[in-house]
């Protein structure tokens, strides 16, 4: 049960907080030793140049502030932009996390080509998607690529080749099917049944 909790909060009893801190400390140390990566998965930061490694370090520092596993954020950036802060898609998706202008505005990104600003906006959006899909990584990744409307309409990963390949690439780097999420952020998608556990 404790592994389903993201962390202690005001409603968490002292004995649960103590146990949670002890159990997650070891888990976090093990994950940190692997660079935030899942064992047996491709490393999205393998072979990065020193300047791109600085971006990866920034992601590792910022992701926990948004309740996002660094490994998932790094996988997204590897697939979205290959760590190019100036990436620009034909659909006008911009920067490291390939934010379209509407999403950038929605998550208060002033300059999508500024690495820190882009990462913060992308993490905020990813955090929202994880809450909306109750921690289901595949659905959150599919929605990051195709939009939550498309995922809801199709009741899962849309039958778009690009999105299906995208989800496969994310899974190659980040294998977890479920991610912790903040259930207070947004009501879950009406297209998927409510699940217990995984939320604060």
Stretches found by the model and what they are:
Residues 1-78, 172-200:
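Cell-wall glycan-active module
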Residues 45-56, 65-66, 70, 88-97, ...:
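Solvent-exposed, acidic/flexible segments
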Residues 60, 64, 105, 131:
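Short polybasic/polar patches that bind polyanions
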Residues 79-82, 102, 147, 175:
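Solvent-exposed coil/turn segments that connect beta secondary-structure elements
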